[in-house]
Design a protein with these regions (language model features):
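Phosphate-end processing signature that detects enzymes handling 5′-triphosphorylated RNA
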Residues: 1-214
Length: 214
């Protein structure tokens, strides 16, 4: 329901994710996070706990111990309400290698390059590492500009000179579209409610064009 709503490009959208840096062990700290986007502005509320505590909390509603004061209880309550309201279950694993760059004089301006964007719908546990289906063709990177205010003039001149223009891209949205296109017949047979709109047809054409160029 959430991802179907997200790819319709609403003014407001939100999602819940369990996030780790690298391949974690069950005793390693991870982040449980609600990511919200309103009118292009992103807001993240997250709290830290061990991976095992995160599984216990998300799967069995067992609240983690806060004896070290590392857990934001207010955020935890919001996450608990969110997951129970939508009856959320883990559906998609997604990983990528990220290169992040910051402007020397303005830490608010950041550019990231993601490669090896990998997804799977089976065995989505984080401790099992990164393997699965590649979201983009080999050699392709996803570049993202992250800034709360105006983009610096020097950077605008560079991307304009290279004829680079912004486009909308969602890792989870793209995974969902590829999943539907690959499994459309079986999903319809099962009677699942899927989203097959103009943007999905457009996505299919773009992917076909990319494949033919490689």
């Amino acid at each position: 329901q959430l991802i179907r709503a997200s790819i319709e490009k609403p003014v407001y959208k939100e999602k819940l994710r369990l996030r780790a840096y690298g391949t974690p062990e069950l005793s390693d700290n991870v982040f449980v996070e609600i990511k919200k986007k309103y009118d292009g502005i992103v807001n993240k509320r997250r709290t830290s706990m061990t991976l095992q505590e995160a599984y216990d909390f998300l799967d069995d509603d067992i609240c983690p111990d806060n004896h070290e004061g590392r857990i934001n209880r207010q955020v935890l309550k919001k996450i608990d309400y969110f997951k129970n309201f939508y009856h959320l279950q883990p559906k998609v694993y997604l990983s990528y290698d990220r290169f992040a760059y910051f402007e020397k004089d303005d830490g608010d301006f950041r550019i990231t390059f993601d490669k090896n964007i990998t997804t799977r719908r089976e065995d989505v546990r984080l401790e099992h590492g990164s393997y699965g289906k590649k979201l983009l063709p080999d050699g392709k990177y996803l570049m993202e500009v992250k800034i709360s205010g105006a983009v610096p003039l020097w950077f605008t001149k560079i991307i304009s000179g290279l004829n680079v223009y912004p486009v909308s891209f969602s890792k989870y949205g793209t995974e969902y579209k590829q999943y539907v296109l690959t499994n459309y017949t079986s999903l319809m047979y099962k009677g699942e409610n899927i989203c097959l709109n103009q943007s999905l047809h457009q996505h299919q054409r773009i992917q076909s064009a990319l494949a033919s160029q490689c």
